[in-house]
Amino acid sequence: TIVCDVLGEENNGTTLAAMNLIRALGAKGHTVTILCPDAQKQGVPGYAVVPTRNLGIFNGYVKSNGVQLAKPDDAVIRQAIQGADIVHVMLPFVLGRRAAQLAKAQGIPVSAGFHAMAENFTSHIFMENCAPVNRLTYHVFSKTYKMVDAIHYPTQFLRDLYEGMYGPTNGYVISNGVNASFKPCPVQKPEEYRDKFVIVATGRYSKEKNQAVLLEAANLSRHRERLQVILAGSGPKEKRLRALGKKLPVAPKFGFFPHDQMVELLNYADLYVHSAAMEAEGISCLEAISCGLVPIISNSPRCATKAYALTDRSLFQFDSPKNLAAKIDWWLDHPQDRARWGSRYAENAAGQFDQEKCMEQMERMLLETAGRRP
C-alpha cells in the first residue's frame, strides 16, 4: 500500500515520484493499493480515497499551489492496508502518520520517504527563514519517521540533514530517477531561436524555485539582446515572473511542455539554470544534465542539487543575479568548454540516475523491509 498525502496532477515532484513508483511496482507484478485524497480517483480500482481538509478562506491558496491536504479516515485506511505486506508512506503528514500507526498496530512493516524539507512546508506560510518553526516542523515529521522500519532518502543531502538532527536510521539513499527518454539526441534548434542563446529553467512558478533571479541575471548579461529564457512550468508566481520578464529585450517564454517537447527543448537549449532556493532532489535538473545540457545551479545550503555540479563554474551564488549573469556569460563565451562539459554531465548522469535501476532499488528496499528478501 502506497500512502500519498499529496496526489493529483503530475506537476510536482512528490506526485511524480509516487506515480513512477506505483507504475514500476505494478509493472513488476506487485499488487499496489494507493491511499490518497484525490477525489477524481474515487471508485477507480486500486485506489482508496480519504476526504480533504476544508481550510475555509485558505482553500484557494492551497489549490493554487497544486496540492490537496488529506483528512484521515480510519475505516478507509484500514481497508487500504488490509492484507498488505508493507505500507510505504510518501510524506510524513497526517494521513501518512495515521496510516503508519494503524499498520504498525497490525504488525505490518512500514517504510517512509523523506521527500520534503521543513522549508518546503514553512515557505507556504512565509516562515522558511524562522529556525524555531523549521525545527518544530522537523519534530512533527520525526514522529512518523521514528515509528517506521526503513526510510527512503532520494539524496544523501536529505539523509545527512535528518540524521544530523535525529541520529542514524535504517536508511536507503535512492534517487527517484530520470526517465530513459531524457538523453542526448540530435535536435535542430527551431528557426525562431537560431540567432538566440536558449536558457531553460524547469519547475513550478513558486517562491522556493526562485526563477526571478534568472530573469534578473538575464537582464545583466552581456548577451541580454540574444538571450531567450524559457521557463517551463506553471504556478502561482506566473504573474510576477511575467512582469519581471517585460524588462528583457527578448520576451521570455512561459508554459508547460509535454514530455516529448521537454526532451527536445533540453537537447537544443544552450544552458540550464536551476535557481531554486531549496530543493530536496531536483529531478528537473537531472533531466537536463542527462540530455547533456550544462547546468548552472544555485549553491543554496538548502539545495541538494548543488551536489550535481561537476565544476565550480556550474554553481552560482543563490541570492546574486550578478554572479549568475557572470556564469551565464562565461559558458556562452566558451562553446567548446560547454560541449565538453555537457558530454561529461550526460555520462555521469547515465550511470547514477537511470529510473529503471532506481525503481529496482526501491523494490529491493520494500521487499527487504517486508521481510521478503529479493
Question: Which ranges hold each PLM region?
Answer:
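Short alpha-helical donor nucleotide-sugar binding micro-motif in glycosyltransferases
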Residues: 81, 256-257, 264-269
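Conserved acidic donor-binding segment of nucleotide-sugar-dependent glycosyltransferases
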Residues: 310-321, 330-335
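Membrane-proximal helix-turn-helix segments that form the acceptor-binding/catalytic region
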Residues: 118, 132-150, 165
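Nucleotide-activated donor-binding/catalytic signature segment of Leloir-type glycosyltransferases, i.e.
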Residues: 239-260
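Short hydrophobic beta-strand element within catalytic cores of glycosyltransferases
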Residues: 294-298
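Conserved donor-binding/catalytic core segment of Leloir-type glycosyltransferases
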Residues: 1, 190-219
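Aromatic "clamp/platform" in nucleotide-sugar-dependent glycosyltransferases that forms part
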Residues: 277
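Carbohydrate-associated surface elements
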Residues: 38, 157, 177
